[in-house]
């Protein structure tokens, strides 16, 4: 449907304009496109040229709508920029296809940016198409195109044209998404990203610096569940194939007057829909009812008063953040920080961010240029207003009593009746007054300190005394959590930059950071869109702080300022086990000796949790991605958000809230909500098989005729005495201790047996894996989830979430997978 509409648009333009022979749409191998020259598409719809913004010498290469389609007064901007983050500082820029077929942007004779690095000595040309797509093509001898080597549609900037995609490539895992500009005349990558959700593929989201800012809701039957996009003419189609999953924007193809609908995300995170009309002008459909929800950004942000003055730096009474911040970021960070009283941009173009924790003083030197300072004052006005209300109540009370006294005298109420009525009136007035004072006090505290009360309650639950926080410059030996300020975390991660992002899990994104003392840390930030919440955060913070073992990851502290909830861990240089185990190249690092050592470490960590720690802990989410590896490839168990503490005599419990990862959950936990130490044993058995085989447990789901999962695959080969066939191919050519490998396979199958009672304990696993006592291993029984090649899982009734209740009946009401 979308492609038909685009074809009609192109055909209409062709008939209207005809083709010009005086301009070219092609750059041949060895030719140069320089500043002042243009490539113009065949029917003059788009042009490619170098340009710069007013009052800036920086040179950019971009694709524009041609002038024929714009009013002369139109404030136009390019739809695509090749070097948005790498501007050329002078006018010497040029574009060329070199002798090896590589597409390059040059500064003088030097390579500034290599857009395509695929080498070919064949005939290669660059062509600007009438769709707005810039393609590097390898040509056959007869002049026909052989293949596309590179195209601009695979690298969108802030604008979506018909034919472009939002989603990911199934083969390369490359993501197609829009990223806002940093400022009006600064096209560098900004703070807002519009694209497909990383976890739920049929949802579009806008992220602000990695945080959920807006969501379209689920795509179902050609519509999003949130009506915002549907009602405003944002028409999409969804494609899901083996080669990728993506949304394609089509616009309103039923409107015969319009064509080339575009979507642009601006610097404030607002989606703008624009369409070109046959009257040869562009109309901006910026309707406030159609904007993506999030921060509301005004010329003067809410809660701030602007002043243009020369002020001194905040170095002594605040902090300065990197130049990659926009004014939107700066105001949002100030609002999130209860100690922030003012902010300003550090650069003339409106980027950078300077925060004051005390009011800025007008002591700038004469050499400093005036800046617009935004001072936070709205909340103080509200607090002052509430003070007036309190004073008014105190003044009104005696006046009310005096009026009552006069009324009683007028009606000749005397003696005991007068006293009784007066006492009742005084009592009611006092109750009312105290109630109002209590309410006003809470209101004032809320306005002054934001979520301070909630923070205090959370600190108490974590066992932390706030009075000692500012005195504690070093971590104590009593396992207390260190409290980090939001500013210190921002500084450590360079404002949660993409370069420092290590990955993302069910909790939220994880970043690498560097503290002021030089120590490297990993920072786990609770996402607002995360399925995990405050309970899991507290659970993990408390548990890891109290558990100390060489095979458990160490938590250093947390940050709970305002709405932020972050955990700070020791940094693991080698990421997680799945990073190596399931990658066809990186898995070669894991020889059998190292794999066995990793299994040993996991066993020791689980044995400590189940038997030897101060607390008896069931992890409930043992999997490859939760096994971190330090610089010496020693394994450490992480992610205790779902862990549960058992009493000394407690052996099992049940829950109405089943949470974990499909493929690793034991059958009794998956079906009935029952969990125990044997649940972790099952998960470990699955992980053992993955380590031995080098495959994910669910890697068979595409094979409808084959086994259900890795467990069933190994079980079938075990019954046929073909265990050697399950061993990872990367291990088969190396020197293997086959008896040890076969023993590990058998131990793993014992761990994944259907009945929990049949599975060994982790203490038994230790003796089994080393073959202590020279006892032969028992034969494993049928594994879980095995019933022929395919088996349907029992239906789950999903109801609203209820709190866990250990004494409740065994019924699953909520199923959460991660």
Curated annotation (Swiss-Prot):
Residues 24-149 form the Bulb-type lectin domain. GO terms for cellular component: plasma membrane. Residues 290-379 form the PAN domain. Its EC number is 2.7.11.1. Residues 496-785 form the Protein kinase domain. The chain crosses the membrane at residues 388-408. Residues 23-387 are extracellular. The modification Phosphoserine is found at residues 530, 625, 638, 699, 807. Disulfide bonds join 330-353, 334-340. It is a single-pass type I membrane protein. GO terms for biological process: immune response; signal transduction. Residues 409-818 are cytoplasmic. Glycans are attached at residues 123, 199, 337. The modification Phosphothreonine is found at residues 655, 813. It is found in: Cell membrane. Residues 1-22 form the signal peptide. Residues 585-602 are annotated as: CaM-binding. It holds the Pfam family B_lectin. It comes from Arabidopsis thaliana (Mouse-ear cress). This is G-type lectin S-receptor-like serine/threonine-protein kinase At1g67520.
């Amino acid at each position: 449907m979308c492609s038909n509409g685009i074809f009609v648009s192109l055909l209409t333009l062709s008939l209207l304009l005809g083709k010009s022979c005086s301009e070219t749409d092609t750059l041949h191998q060895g030719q140069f496109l320089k500043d002042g020259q243009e490539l113009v598409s065949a029917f003059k719809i788009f042009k490619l040229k170098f340009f710069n913004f007013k009052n800036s010498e920086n040179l950019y290469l971009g694709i524009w709508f041609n002038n024929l389609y714009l009013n002369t007064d139109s404030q136009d901007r390019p739809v695509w920029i090749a070097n948005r983050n790498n501007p050329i500082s002078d006018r010497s820029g040029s574009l060329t296809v070199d002798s090896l077929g590589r597409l390059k942007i040059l500064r003088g004779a030097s390579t500034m940016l290599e857009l395509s690095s695929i080498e070919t000595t064949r005939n290669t040309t660059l062509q600007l198409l009438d769709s707005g797509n810039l393609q590097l093509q390898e040509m056959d001898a007869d002049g026909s195109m052989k293949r596309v080597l590179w195209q601009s549609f695979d690298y969108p900037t802030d604008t979506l044209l018909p034919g472009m995609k939002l989603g990911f490539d199934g083969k390369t895992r490359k993501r197609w998404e829009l990223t806002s500009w940093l400022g009006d005349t600064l096209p560098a990558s900004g703070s807002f990203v519009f694209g497909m959700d990383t976890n739920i593929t049929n949802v579009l989201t806008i992220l602000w610096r990695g945080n959920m800012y807006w969501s379209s809701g689920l795509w179902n039957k050609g519509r999003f569940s949130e009506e915002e996009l549907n009602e405003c003419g944002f028409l999409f189609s969804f494609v899901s194939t083996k080669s990728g999953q993506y949304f394609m924007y089509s616009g309103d193809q039923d409107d015969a007057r319009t064509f080339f609908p575009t979507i642009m995300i601006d610097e404030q995170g607002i989606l703008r829909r624009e369409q070109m009309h046959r009257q040869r002008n562009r109309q901006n459909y910026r309707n406030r009812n159609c904007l993506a929800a999030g921060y509301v950004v005004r010329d003067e942000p809410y809660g701030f008063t602007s002043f243009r003055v020369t002020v001194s730096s905040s170095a002594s009474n605040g902090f300065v953040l990197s130049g990659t911040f926009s004014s939107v970021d700066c105001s949002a960070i100030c609002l999130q920080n209860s100690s922030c009283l003012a902010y300003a941009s550090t650069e003339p173009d409106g980027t950078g961010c300077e925060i004051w924790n005390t009011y800025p003083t007008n002591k700038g030197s004469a050499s400093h240029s005036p800046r617009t300072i935004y001072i936070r004052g709205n909340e103080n006005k509200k607090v002052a207003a509430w003070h007036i209300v309190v004073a008014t109540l105190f003044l009104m009370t005696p006046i009310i009593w005096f009026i009552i006294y006069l009324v009683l005298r007028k009606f000749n109420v005397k003696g005991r009746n007068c006293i009784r009525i007066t006492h009742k009136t005084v009592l009611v007035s006092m109750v009312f007054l105290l109630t109002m004072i209590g309410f006003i006090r809470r209101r004032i505290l809320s306005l002054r300190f934001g979520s301070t009360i909630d923070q205090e309650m959370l600190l108490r639950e974590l066992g932390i005394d706030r009075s000692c926080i500012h005195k504690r410059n070093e971590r104590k030996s009593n396992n207390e959590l260190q409290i980090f300020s939001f500013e210190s975390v921002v500084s450590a991660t360079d404002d949660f930059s993409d370069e420092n992002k290590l990955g993302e899990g069910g909790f939220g994104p994880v970043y690498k950071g560097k503290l002021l003392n030089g120590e490297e840390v990993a920072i786990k930030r609770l996402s607002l869109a995360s399925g995990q919440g405050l309970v899991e955060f507290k659970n993990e913070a408390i548990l890891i702080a109290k558990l100390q073992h060489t095979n458990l990851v160490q938590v250093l502290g947390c940050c709970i300022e305002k709405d932020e909830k972050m955990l700070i861990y020791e940094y693991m240089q080698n990421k997680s086990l799945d990073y190596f185990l399931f990658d066809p190249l990186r898995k070669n690092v894991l020889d059998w000796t190292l794999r066995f050592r990793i299994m040993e470490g996991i066993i020791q960590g689980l044995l400590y949790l189940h038997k030897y720690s101060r607390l008896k802990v069931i992890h409930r989410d043992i999997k490859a991605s939760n096994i971190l590896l330090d610089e010496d490839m020693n394994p450490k168990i992480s992610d205790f958000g779902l862990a549960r503490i058992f009493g000394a005599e407690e052996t099992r419990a049940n829950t109405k809230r089943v949470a974990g990862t499909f493929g690793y959950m034991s059958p009794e936990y998956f079906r009935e909500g029952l969990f125990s130490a044997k649940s972790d044993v099952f998960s470990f058995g699955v992980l053992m098989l993955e380590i031995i085989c080098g495959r994910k447990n669910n890697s068979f789901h595409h094979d409808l005729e084959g086994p259900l999962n890795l467990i069933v695959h190994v079980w079938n080969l075990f019954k046929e005495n073909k265990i050697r066939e399950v061993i990872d191919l990367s291990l088969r050519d190396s020197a293997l201790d086959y008896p040890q490998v076969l023993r590990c396979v058998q131990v793993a199958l014992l761990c994944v047996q259907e009945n929990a009672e049949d599975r060994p304990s982790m203490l038994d696993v230790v003796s089994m894996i080393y073959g202590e006592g020279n006892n032969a291993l028992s034969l494993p029984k049928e594994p879980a989830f095995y019933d022929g090649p395919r088996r349907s899982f029992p239906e789950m009734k999903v109801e609203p979430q209820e709190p866990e209740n250990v004494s409740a009946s065994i019924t699953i009401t909520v199923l959460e997978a991660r």
